[in-house]
Amino acid sequence: MNRRSFAALLPALAASLPALAESQASPGSGANKKLIETGVYPGFTPPGQFSGRAGHSFFHGMLPTEIGCEAHVSYLAVGAQHEPEEKHTHSEIWLVREGKVELRLNGESHMLGAGDVGIAVAGTMHWVRNAGDTVASYFVLEVGTGPIGH
């Protein structure tokens, strides 16, 4: 293949890159491009007995402005950690509903109680665990440019 033939293929190659990137995304990434619609989303009551964590996603997708958004409520059993310490390309905001949680942000621990809010902007190492002696629950709002994946 000479340079002229190769150059003729470049537009087709460039056009195929977005599809290739999407096909290479891990199947369990959870990225969701579904359009979020205006509305009311029903709540969730956790089972009477659970170990670790329980939760409910209210919505997960894209706002009309191309902003990825996901909202859920999580319930943590005493001592339970939500997930391993990690960072994301999106931001996460927590609003504690009940109980006491420890929110670690870039290695610094913060104790939050009912009504407290914490935020980890994109790129912040973080994790949450139940630091109290009763079930803890909190709402999470995740926002970022592009789809939110898990």
Where on the chain are the PLM-derived regions?
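A generic "binding-loop/recognition-motif" signal
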Residues: 80, 89-90, 108, 124, ...
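Ligand-binding loop in jelly-roll beta-barrel domains
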Residues: 122-148
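Histidine-centered metal-chelating micro-motifs
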Residues: 81-83, 87, 102, 118, ...
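A short, N-terminal "cap"/entry segment at the start of jelly-roll beta-barrel domains
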Residues: 2-68, 83, 150
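Short, conserved beta-strand element in jelly-roll/cupin
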Residues: 75-76, 87-102
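Short acidic-glycine-tyrosine-enriched beta hairpin
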Residues: 108-122
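Aromatic/pi-system hotspot detector in well-structured domains
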Residues: 69-72, 117
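Conserved short histidine dyad/triad with adjacent acidic residue
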Residues: 57, 72-88
